[in-house]
Amino acid sequence: MHILTPTQAPLVPNPPHELMYTSSPLQISLPDFRRLCIFKGIYPPREPRNKKKVSKGSTAATTFYYTKDIQYLLHEPLLAKFREHKAVAKKIGRALGRGESGDASRLEKNLMPKVKLDHIIKERYPTFVDALRDLDDALSMLFLFANLPSSDHIPAKTIALCQRLTREFEHYVITSHSLRKSFLSIKGIYYQATIQGQDILWLVPYRFVQRTGGDIDFRIMGTFVEFYTTLLGFVNYRLYTSIGLVYPPKFNARSDEQGGELAAFQLEGKATATNGASNGHAEDAEINPEAQAIADRIGAMPDVEEEEATTAVAKTGAEDDEEEANEEIDKFEPTAPDADILPQPQASSAEVASLFAPFTFYLSRETPRGSLEFILKAFGCKRVGWDGVLGDGAFTTNESDPAITHQIVDRPALSNGAPASNVQETENGGAAAPKAQWPYSMMPGRTYVQPQWVWDSINQGKLLRADHYSPGADLPPHLSPWVKPKKGEYDPNLPLAAQQPEGEAEAFEDEGDEETAFDVDGDEDMEAIVDREGSVEVGEGMDVADDSEDDSDDDESDEEDGPAGDEDDLDSDAESDISEGEAARLQHQRELEAEATGKKLEVKKPTRKEENATIRKKAEKKKRAEEEERERQKMMLSNKKRKLLKRIEYGENKRDNESENLRRKRARVEKAKAAAEAV
């Protein structure tokens, strides 16, 4: 494999002054070459095996490219644009050198070539599905730049373009109800949408004050942003036209200046402008392309055929309603505890899309308004209100509005969350609506939840219990919806008893009792031992032995106890069997004595500790038998497979130990919580 650099010379991060690129077959500079490679999707391959031979003995940092990639770039039309740009830059430089700033600005305005990437988008993505598959990185990059502050490296024009494109994409997701899952992580908020059968996952950073460091190459990132903005513009146009909407949507600059964000865009259908009922926007009204096509056909038909067409449409709608009514989701339940768990069928997209449709939400000032508004509207909610200081576009800014059913808060209540009682009289003498101001008062009949309730509800596809997410409550764990727990791993969603192996609960209980007894009685027992009558402390009438004598005694005791300890370990199974047999024999003997004397046998009820010990012994015996059987099976394997199995068992044992530690920690926390509630 012959490998060639674009300049017939090694490419280094900081090329020396004497390295000339004019002899390059592409006739462009190194920054332009890297920019062109990003546009065309050409990336350096891995280092070749014969790196020393290809580098001709050079040890400098070198980037290699395939010869076919360089030949592929020779026919790129952008090369002419780069050369024109270089020529105009020289003219502008000469004008500035002569002090003719007016001529320089005129040259920059009139002669500077515009680089268009439309042909590259069509070349890299022959089909629309290909563009959707490559949309993850584009959305993550554009959402990142949309939340960055403007600076010398990032012009405000680029940030405004990223904000416009990303909000247009969010409007499509809201209108089509394509959002499926979301997750709050340390990096930001992950979103997953399903568009035309393709799962698209992107990351949106939290809205904090971003501080960019000096070690970031904004020139490379700006090149990616330039390409991704063109790509997302193509994708948005195709998505909008596929559902019968006009692209680009109308933009209200005044609303955007007032913090409207999504509210600054107004969607319109191709036939007539649509104004939604909530927040005055058209994202609430969906346009079905199939229904629009049928309506267009009906309008072109003669009057005689209109009745038949209308009847056909009504019949089709009735059949669809009947199919939706008969839809039932089958649940696959495991037949045995160790059986494979089949993936459960998901609820219909229509049900999930209207998850929050019946409710009216109000967002408190401390909650993330942008992400909550996007998620709530994407899942059917048409009425979202917030305080006026958060921006324009709210359904209502009155927190005391009686139409509000849910209020999302992110701080505990003050004054014990007392209901709103300051009822005032109106001018006509009637009672006015009470004024509710969280966290000082609560509105009767309104549900107060924390923001995590929204994320957990959409990830599970159903409305969860609101009392588990009440203000100030300990929230359940927020888990990633894309990571499914494997068999044997700890699952925080399941109850502890459902994932504990046999005998583990009893062992945890005994450990907890021993720790409690030691903590409570430890000091008292020690004082009783030290202060007992007749005790002699060190220095009171006795000699202290030398360290050497103590060491020798300890060594002798260790030598004497060593073999005995080994024998105890080896004969533990036999002792457990003997103890069980001895207990049965003693019980039988007591029964015979009671029968001979005519007395009633007193049945001694075992204590909780004895029951736990019995269950634990049975579990240990069963586990020991399984391990012995496994060892016998491993003896039949070859040495190679035995080593492979050993590595597998190492990973399984490590995972089991981690799961056991987590279960032990959870058992300790639940026990402490139960004790606190009992008190």
From Swiss-Prot:
GO process terms (BP): maturation of 5.8S rRNA from tricistronic rRNA transcript (SSU-rRNA, 5.8S rRNA, LSU-rRNA); maturation of LSU-rRNA from tricistronic rRNA transcript (SSU-rRNA, 5.8S rRNA, LSU-rRNA)
PANTHER family reported for this sequence: PESCADILLO - RELATED, PESCADILLO HOMOLOG
Coiled coil regions in record: 573-679
Superkingdom, taxonomy of origin: Eukaryota
Similarity comment: family membership: Belongs to the pescadillo family.
Residues making up the signal peptide according to the UniProt record: none
A single cellular component GO annotation: nucleoplasm
InterPro entries per the UniProt record, alphabetical: BRCT_dom, BRCT_dom_sf, PES
UniProt key word Disulfide bond: no
Compositional bias segments (type: Basic and acidic residues): 582-614, 623-634, 646-662, 669-679
GO molecular function: ribonucleoprotein complex binding; RNA binding
Compositionally biased spans, kind Polar residues: 418-427
HAMAP family xref list: Pescadillo
Keywords, ordered alphabetically: Coiled coil, Nucleus, Ribosome biogenesis, rRNA processing
Annotated function: Component of the NOP7 complex, which is required for maturation of the 25S and 5.8S ribosomal RNAs and formation of the 60S ribosome.
Annotated Acidic residues bias: 503-528, 543-580
Chain residue ranges for the region called Disordered: 413-437, 480-679
Domain BRCT positions: 351-471
The protein's assembly and partners: Component of the NOP7 complex, composed of erb1, nop7 and ytm1. The complex is held together by erb1, which interacts with nop7 via its N-terminal domain and with ytm1 via a high-affinity interaction between the seven-bladed beta-propeller domains of the 2 proteins. The NOP7 complex associates with the 66S pre-ribosome.
Localisation: Nucleus, Nucleolus; Nucleus, Nucleoplasm
Transmembrane segments: none
Main location: nucleus
Protein name: Pescadillo homolog
